[in-house]
Amino acid sequence: MDFIMANTGAGGGVDTQAQLMQSAAAAAAVAATNAAAAPVQNAAAVAAAAQLQQQQVQQAILQVQQQQTQQAVAAAAAAVTQQLQQQQQAVVAQQAVVQQQQQQAAAVVQQAAVQQAVVPQPQQAQPNTNGNAGSGSQNGSNGSTETRTNLIVNYLPQTMTEDEIRSLFSSVGEIESVKLIRDKSQVYIDPLNPQAPSKGQSLGYGFVNYVRPQDAEQAVNVLNGLRLQNKTIKVSFARPSSDAIKGANLYVSGLPKTMTQQELEAIFAPFGAIITSRILQNAGNDTQTKGVGFIRFDKREEATRAIIALNGTTPSSCTDPIVVKFSNTPGSTSKIIQPQLPAFLNPQLVRRIGGAMHTPVNKGLARFSPMAGDMLDVMLPNGLGAAAAAATTLASGPGGAYPIFIYNLAPETEEAALWQLFGPFGAVQSVKIVKDPTTNQCKGYGFVSMTNYDEAAMAIRALNGYTMGNRVLQVSFKTNKAK
């Protein structure tokens, strides 16, 4: 104001004063503009600093991640290297064991050669004139030369092949022949060579025949108890065939679906020496079985004792009574004890299986549903007497089996379903589902062959009219008209 007044006093004009006031206003506006711009510039600087700090943090995180990745890769590489070293050490150890076995076998051969040169040879045993190969013994000392070279190998892994068996046992001595016993009714496709001809599934045992008896004895000493995969194999001398050891194989049904092979052997072990055992597994299900197994005893009399003691009983490891009988021997069980019906064939459950239960007509087979009755009346018009008379014509199946015809099966039906359906009634020899070659689905019918006529008739009585899925089955003995 002093400046304005001074200029006014000097110039004294109104115009000059107005100009000065305008200049002051302009200066004030510039100052105000500058003052307003200062906070904006400060905010921009703060934002730039924050962005820079964020970039630095991201770079630090990226560096940490890269370091972690490098450490993980290094750890994985170290683990792989360690695993390879362990595998190499295992291979070296296995080679050392094989080499030691070969050295032991060579020592035995040399010792036998020395003994043969010093000790005079015994006279050849006189041939057996009683029509069989003799009772023999498990160690083969009383058997023929063939017996003393022939070994039976039990508890083989399911996937082990004849070539692998030959490779294992040839490390001891020269082998004349190897035979792996397979189940001809179960088709096995080699997963490593699907195009190869299908074979029966391994039954878990086989035979190895050596050229020299001393090699066979050495194989028993060295390989018996060897751990292969998840099995411990049993190697012993095979015995010649005789009446005392024939027919010592038992068929067992009604077992819990979760029973193990060890539990099955524990039931039968008190009755004699078990040569081998087996439980049928469900295809595609390693945790459940078909509830059916086999036990082979050393002698038939041991198997007979087991049948008398266990058939129709409920062992502590079972929930239902079990059926025990000779395997693949029609009617043999009935010579010892009266056959007993499976526990589930009671009137209450029969009503659930096949509908209303009717009174038998003319002492014939009971009808478990209207459809079942009609079919059985057609197949067996004279009741059970006609059925017994027809048994001679129905026994024309392979191996004396009784073929059963099953109709109205669903397209998705597999053979395992029929195994489960007919297995509880008795010994099933084979199952066949007829499939359309173009769709690979069931054409609506199939066949089941059973060993025993009474069991086959029982299965027909119970299952004819049985509802499987949403279909009512028609079950009857196969005739020449069934195709």
Curated annotation (Swiss-Prot):
GO terms for cellular component: Cajal body; nucleus; ribonucleoprotein complex. Residues 120-146 are annotated as: Disordered. Required for the proper development and maintenance of neurons presumably by affecting RNA metabolism. It comes from the Eukaryota. Belongs to the RRM elav family. It comes from Drosophila melanogaster (Fruit fly). Keywords: Repeat, RNA-binding. Residues 120-144 have a biased composition (Low complexity). GO terms for molecular function: mRNA binding; mRNA regulatory element binding translation repressor activity; poly(U) RNA binding; RNA binding. Residues 149-240, 248-329, 402-480 form the RRM domain. One of its GO terms (biological process) is embryo development ending in birth or egg hatching. InterPro entries: ELAD_HU_SF, Elav_RRM1, Hud_Sxl_RNA, Nucleotide-bd_a/b_plait_sf, RBD_domain_sf, RRM_dom. This is Protein elav.
